[in-house]
Amino acid sequence: MDWTGARARTSWGKRPQTAALGLAATFRHLNTDDHRPIEQTTQTPYSLHRPLPPPSGEPATDTPTHSSCPAPPIAVPSSLLLPRTTHPSSRSSHICACHTPVTARHSPNRLCPVSLPTPTPRSMAQGTKAPAAAMPPNSSVLNMPALNAVNRKKQKRREKEAAKKAAQDPSPPATLRNGVSSGSTHLPANAAHTRQPAPHYDDPELDDPQYDDEDDADFYSDEEAEHYEHAYGTNGHYQQGYAHAPIPSSSKKPRKKKKGAAAHPPHAYTQHVAPRHSPAPNHSMVTSGSKSIWNTSTVEERERIREFWLSLGEDERKSLVKIEKEAVLRKMKEQQKHSCSCSVCGRKRTAIEEELEVLYDAYYEELEQYAHLQQDVGRFLPDANFGHVRSAPHPRPLMTTHPPPGPYDDEEEDEYSGEDDEEDIFKYLPPPDAADFLRFGSSLTVKGGILTVADDLLKNDGKKFIEMMEQLAERRMQREEEANFHAHPSMHRYNSAHNHAPQPEEEEYDDEVDEEEGFEDEDYEEDDEDEDEAMTEEQRMEEGRRMFQIFAARMFEQRVLQAYREKVAAERQKRLLEELEEENEKKDQKEAKKAKEAQKRKEKKEKQRQIKAEEKAKKDAELAAKEAELKAAEEKRLEEQRKKREEQRKKKEAERKAQEEEKQRKEAERQKRLQEERDRQQELERKAREQKALEKKVKDDAKRKERDRAGSQGEGGSGRRRPTTTASARSVKVCRSPHGILSSFVPKAPTPSRPRQTSRQGSHGSSPKTPQVAPGTSKSMSPTSQAQGNMMPKSILTKPANSQHAGHHPLGQPSSPMPPIGPPPGLSGPPGLSMGLPPGLNGFPGPGSMLPNMMSPRPGMPFFPQPPVPQAFRGFPPPGMAGPRGFPMDGPPGLGPMPGFAGPNQAPPFGMGPPTQHSRQGSGSFASMDVPISAPSVQPIHRPAPIQRPSSVKPHDSNKHGQDSDVDELADHLGSKALLDEEDVPEIPDRRSSVQQHGSMRSMPIGFGFPDAPNSHQSTAFNGFGSANTASIWGTPPSQAFSSAAGPWGNSPTSGFFTNPLTMSSPRVSDHRAPNEPRLVWLRRVICTVCKMLSSRHAGPDGFIDANEVQQQLDAFRDPREPVVTQEELKEACDIIDGTHNNGGGSLEYKNLGDGRLSHIKFVDTTGPPPALGEIGSPIPSHSLPVAGFGGRFPGLGPQGF
């Protein structure tokens, strides 16, 4: 029964070439340019041939022929070669004598599969390769009924010649890709060299019309071609030798939209055929490849897939097949869910399920046999049944008839990488029409030299497979219908029980058949006798099973590949975890190594630190030992110094006690002497009072007598009055004699060796100069002139009314007008500045400044000094009566006397002047004229002249000098002079002219009142009341002998005595020994000063100075009145440890010689560095006011002594 329709004269089982061509589509060793004879190409499962000559009735260029085929091309019914998209025009197709369907177009790209084994389970599992001569024609290729008698005859002849030639020239065994020859292949059980009877075909008018070859090459749309664009070559490149072959353009007008692009080259996979002599790779190279699971080549991947399949157990293999079978059944049920529900379709579905189970069971048995065979032989099976030509891996995956152990290209993985299960393979499309299953034959069409049965099935989402299964299921029904048809020929073959719509392509096929009936009927009629070769039922079943295995193998490949990839993914995941673990382990090891190294470095540093600590501790211990030694030495030195200080203190205490005792003794003696002097003075005063009283009485008596006598003798002459006066004077002289001699005596003239000067009684303004007359002229003066000067009588005790003191000017001073006076008495200039007065200005000593920190006169003291006593009295107090003061003249130790008060060893201020000679003022008688006029001169002190009568009444008797010597001796010692000792009388030198040339070098350097000012001479070391003896800035000479201690204005040109003008060579006043200053203190201070001065010039490398040089400087600084400094005193002064401000400060070190003398001396300054000056506007308090007042030194403003 023919399942293609009423006009079909043959059934599915009568078309064995369809199954054979479908199986041939699994072979991948393709070559369109192979023109070898059949006997030379039998090593491959199919051979490539040149096109056959065109059949009769068509151009030679359009008829595809195979040069190696002896039989002419045979027309194939278009019902088996119908394309998917039908066209109403008639088409014609031809089949070569080798039963390969060819078309009129694309003749260079046709294949001629020969030498196909019988599709038994054993042959499919083992995939044998045998020479073409050893295989019967009916075992691989069955003769199809020809549309033309000539073609059938040629086919028969060629078939016979090919069989004979194959039997005579057997081809060598084919070489497998892995180097395994085909000698071990198994021939099918039904293989025979006998020719099978030719099948009988029905009338040719019942066949499907032929179709043009233009549609044969266009069974795949552009969308379908996209599915294969990615799997051509490794990394997207073509293999060498796989270039596009030029495709001749069609001579006919295209009838389909796909033919419009006929000029373009076909899809890439159409030309990707293996070269004829491709070398097979060595199996050892595959096994010795890298075992890396990350980067694997195609050969390695195939080897791994094969090993994976062989490593699977029986249960795992069954599970894979079972999953596949269940998936297919589920898909088929889904596809037929909305199909016809008639009894015929129901029986068909049941038959499909049963047939599917049987096919899968048989397929699993073949897989088991293949697995056992691979495990036993240890090599790959031939590629005849599995479609894998190992000598040239094809870039595009094709369907195979063997299970998935075969290798796969990388493109296969890319193609199916997104297909996780079988559902990804099937793509749902609209359900086909009733006759769409007939289009399954279009998958057998050659396209670009490649048969694509399995790909076409897969691309239609299993629809073709379901149709194929339906066809297989309908075989039983077809056999029943065929039996009924032979029994009742009038019955129509079409199953009217179906509800399916009639096939729309039948009319089109009629048109096509009518066009070619003219030349096809003749061929069928001529070869009717040769159509005795028919296919048995078993062969038809085998053909169907082969078609199923083609699809099932391709589906199962994906299952195995998916399982393999899952395994590889698991292995890679495991390997990744292992690598991560290894990486973590390496990282941990690296970190541990780093930690270990860090620990080593830390230990090394700790060790170094300990070494440094030990060294430091050792150094500290040594330093502590040195410090302890130094401390012990220092303590020893301090102890020695303490002992020395104690000894010095005891010594000083003893000296002080001795001095106090000496002072007390001297004070007692002085008090005793003073008491004696007071007693003597009181006695003398008493006697003088008595004598004065007696003299007054005598004088009064004499005056009274004279008045009486004058009254009685009023008219008497002068001659009579002279004896009376003489007598009265003589009587008075007798009374004045201190020795009690009452006898009168003749007065004598004053001692000529001691001339005296009469005192001036008038004022300076009225009588600038007192005239003096020579002694010789005194006798010629009349009493009248004397009376004019003294209008009233005077006694020796009466003070003249108009007498004025002349203490401001010493005797001998010219009576010319004096220069203008200086500042008022008691007021000094600015403190601290010895400005002095301009030339010609006279100064007065004052009590000092009234400013703070300066001494001022004590309360009760007059602001100005008291004027001196008149000239008639002595100008200085008695011994011990220095003046009305209630405090010592000297200041505190180390300081000078108070301002305005001279010290005990100083002369009175220049305002007082030196003491005048002991003389009395003349009474203005003629005796004053006895002295000739002469220049004033300073005469030494001499005895005062005795009281005599006036010269007018003095007898001119000069020969009584010897008689009155005793009286003169007593007269010279009258008064206060009698109280003075001979040693207490000062020897005052003659006064020099006080007028000095301005700018004279004899003046002292200008001083500023500071004790430490350069070249400042002062009486004490540090006088806080200003400099006492500083010169004036006006060039006036200083007064060192009779200047005031607080005379900062300098000295007047008319006061004081001159000092040494060469003051630069004179020693500093501070280096002189101060009053009441201990000698050791002064000596130490001078030694310190000398050492400081010589340290910059004569000091040795250690700072010591020769002791002899120091002693020479001491002798230069020593006052002539001071004793010479001895070595013992020098050493004793250096032993003073307590350096103070008074004794020079610091400390003195010395070196001893063997005999106890000093060899070297060194001064060590123990004071700190001078204080730093403050910022501008922020003075340091220590600089705001000197410590010692305005007379003290400035701290820290220069070297010592400034």
Swiss-Prot record:
Record has Glycoprotein as a keyword: no
Repeat listed as a keyword: no
Residue ranges, annotated region (Disordered): 28-217, 236-291, 390-423, 487-543, 579-852, 904-967, 979-1015
Composition bias type Basic and acidic residues, residue spans: 158-167, 579-710, 954-967
This protein's GO CC annotations: cytoplasm
Compositional bias ranges of the Acidic residues kind: 204-217, 408-423, 504-536
Coarse class of the protein's main subcellular location: cytoplasm
CDD domains for this protein: UDM1_RNF168 (cd22265)
Alphabetic keyword roster: Coiled coil, Cytoplasm, Stress response
Biased composition range(s): Basic residues: 252-261
Ranges in coiled-coil conformation: 557-704
Compositional bias (Pro residues): 816-828
Biased amino acid composition, Polar residues: 178-187, 754-789, 916-926
Biased composition (Low complexity): 830-848
Locations listed in the record: Cytoplasm
Family designation: Belongs to the NST1 family.
Function field: May act as a negative regulator of salt tolerance.
Record's protein name: Stress response protein NST1
